Amino acid sequence: MSKGKLEQVSAACHHLGFFNNAGLSAHYKLSESSSPAVADLRGLVYAAAGDLLRKHRILFAIPVNEGTPNPHFACLPWIDLRRSIAFLERSVPLASAAEEQDKELDAILEEQHNIDFQTDYGTLPFWRLIILRSKGRNDFTASFIYHHAIGDGVSGLAFHKAFCNALEAASSSTLPTDRAENIIRPDENTVVLPPLEELHPMPISPRQPPLPTASPKEWTGASIHLPCKSRWASLYISPSASNAFVQECKEMKLSVTSALSSVVAAVLFDNLPSRVEALTCIIPVSVRPWLKLPPQVIDNAIGTYFDALRVRLTRAEQRSQDPSPVGIWCGARQVSRSINAYLCDVSPSGEPYTSVAAFKTVPDVSAVFRSTLGKPRDAAFEVTNVGLFPPAAIRRPSRWKAGNVLLSRSAAVPGAAVTVSVVTGRDGTMALGFSWQEGVVEDGFMHRVRQGVWKYFEKYQS
């Protein structure tokens, strides 16, 4: 199975130790109207995972020849769930949204994001599932950790949407879960979806990029270097505060992503020396709306289908029109204009021009990434917002409720100094995750940034 350029980029970064994996965690709780407890959670998870795997062939795929100019996918003949799913038990009760952070889950995620998929290569899939069970038998958190060539951030939502449905089906089944299979083979009637190049024309803009102008003093953290140790911390915004923030964004006619990007920029400016005049932000953009696939396939696809844009935010512009301690709306409008310009800059065939199209002209992406070592990075921060975990398609009483969700990832060696990953759960809680590379920014600095973001949202708390 051939790889597209986005998959090749992820494969090269994994091979070089530049990026290990992404993750999406979701908390599941048995409804009070259901049976009092789950007697065999392991069997139930195995049954749900087996059902899901048979529907998503990509989860059997492993990258081959990652460090070469022509990597490709091979398909495992089977997956042993006993080796790919780990069961842990919480040592302390699950933190509530009011407590801002799930430190126990954060520690697990940080460990997972520092573990690649090289061990037992050829026998294990390039994903793993961590089940963190609360004391008692009625709720758990499932963390899906996966290679970026297998899926993007939206794919994490697709996985949990499928897992939630499979969990419900397994709970409703009359078959005993203690007989659930642990060896899962792919359904030969399923296929790996094509790469981006086969579903999108990936047009390259005929316009030349603007000539460089005098650059203000920017901050991008320490230069690009190895080795990479990823650091991680989460922040949960309550449903009431999240809803109030979203409503204010709507009143301002701005997207949540635009506003969040400006919040992070404002907090960074507040924690950086006054001589820092500008910050560049990377914003990933899903290109799924323009893929040549039926909507129902796109919505449930696990694959790599995204692009990214950049916007420069300046301290002067942010402060000149908004003198409040953390003024964000001027910056949010600037981000919004950049997003709209990206979406409106369309090719003759109707799709926006993509920045990832430039990789089509690169024969060996590994060489490109190796050449970045020792050089300054080109962005201060990235904000990835995958939106809302979609509600169940069938509105009927269900045994399992999916609540908090959390998007997470390794630090990217050649990427932005700070990455903020955002997702909103079915319960309305908006979760922000902060990842950074040790040695690129200090832990104390990131603690202040996280606290600054939390302080901004305090005004929305009811």
Curated annotation (Swiss-Prot):
Deleted gene: phenotype: Does not affect the production of fumivalines and fumicicolins.
InterPro entries: Alcohol_O-acetyltransferase, Atf2/Sli1-like, CAT-like_dom_sf
Inducing or repressing factors: Expressed in copper depleted conditions via the regulation of the macA transcription factor.
Keyword set includes Transferase: yes
Top-level lineage group: Eukaryota
UniProt-listed Enzyme Commission number(s): 2.3.1.-
Enzyme class: transferase
Pathway assigned to this chain's UniProt record: Secondary metabolite biosynthesis
UniProt-recorded Gene Ontology molecular function terms: N-acetyltransferase activity
Record keywords: Transferase
Family that this chain belongs to: Belongs to the alcohol acetyltransferase FCK4 family.
General function of this protein: Probable alcohol acetyltransferase; part of the crm gene cluster that mediates the biosynthesis of a yet unidentified copper-responsive metabolite. In contrast to crmA, is not involved in the biosynthesis of fumivalines or fumicicolins.
Protein name, entry field: Probable alcohol acetyltransferase crmB
